[in-house]
Each structure stands twice: as C-alpha cells, then as structure tokens.
Amino acid sequence: MHCPFCSENDTKVIDSRLVADGHQVRRRRQCLACSERFTTFESAELVMPKVIKSNGNREPFNEDKMVGGVQRALEKRPVSADAIELAISTIKSQLRATGEREVPSEMIGNLVMGQLKELDKVAYIRFASVYRSFEDIREFGEEIAKLED
C-alpha cells in the first residue's frame, strides 16, 4: 500500500480490527520510510447482477428504483425505517446469493413482494396491484384471499 504522505510503497500493518458488524476490516498502518501512520478500510466488492427487463433489455441493478417502489408501497404505514433497511438489505443479499450475473426483473419483484408480505400486508397488496397490473376489484379480492389462507 502506498503511503499517502510520501508515496513510498513499503508500509506495515500495526493493527487490524473488524468493524461495521464484521463487514469491514480497519487497518492501522505505518510507513517504513517516513514513519507516518494512517488508517485504511477494507471491504468486499459486492457486485449486483444486471437486470433483464421484460422486454429483453438489460440494465444495471438500480437500488434507488427498488427502494422507491418499496417506500411508495409502505407510505403512511406503521413500519420503521430500520425494518425497511433490513428488507432492502435482505433482497440485495438474496440477489447476490443467486450467483447469477443477470436476473430477470420478475425475480426482483417477487423478492420485494416476499419482504413486503412479511412487513405489512397492506403494503404488499399495494405493491402487488401495481406490479401485477390488477385490472379490477376481483383481482384485489383474490390476492387478499390468498393472504388470509
């Protein structure tokens, strides 16, 4: 690792600790040339799969788009920000766990519905009605009946 003070290549690690619930390593380093100390953080590069849209187009995973859909469904519902963050994190972990480089958008929608079903049934119905393009009240009733089973 290059020293940020003198740009020398030789540095040594003085101390290493896990931080961010074990998702990062904090390293205290010292330059062997100028003796300055500095801190680095190391974390895994987590690459999200590309999304295959229903029309066949491929695009990068857009977390903001997913979060927006979840937040719209949960608008004015009694669900904490922490619970929402955990649901988003769970969905992203499930997507990475597939090991696939590309996933269909339908899979993402189903994962979102699964999390919403656990968080809040009303939000689930809201999301499902848009995602599945409900045409009439009968479709709402059928989906609600499935929830009651």
From Swiss-Prot:
One of its GO terms (molecular function) is ATP binding. Keywords: ATP-binding, DNA-binding, Metal-binding, Nucleotide-binding, Repressor, Transcription, Transcription regulation, Zinc, Zinc-finger. A zinc finger (unnamed) spans 3-34. PROSITE patterns: ATP_CONE (PS51161). Binds 1 zinc ion. Its cofactor is Zn(2+). Pfam families: ATP-cone, Zn_ribbon_NrdR. InterPro entries: ATP-cone_dom, NrdR-like_N, RNR_NrdR-like. One of its GO terms (biological process) is negative regulation of DNA-templated transcription. It comes from the Bacteria. The keyword Zinc-finger applies. Residues 49-139 form the ATP-cone domain. Signal peptide: none annotated. Belongs to the NrdR family. Negatively regulates transcription of bacterial ribonucleotide reductase nrd genes and operons by binding to NrdR-boxes. PANTHER family: TRANSCRIPTIONAL REPRESSOR NRDR (PTHR30455:SF2). This is Transcriptional repressor NrdR. It comes from Vibrio atlanticus (strain LGP32).
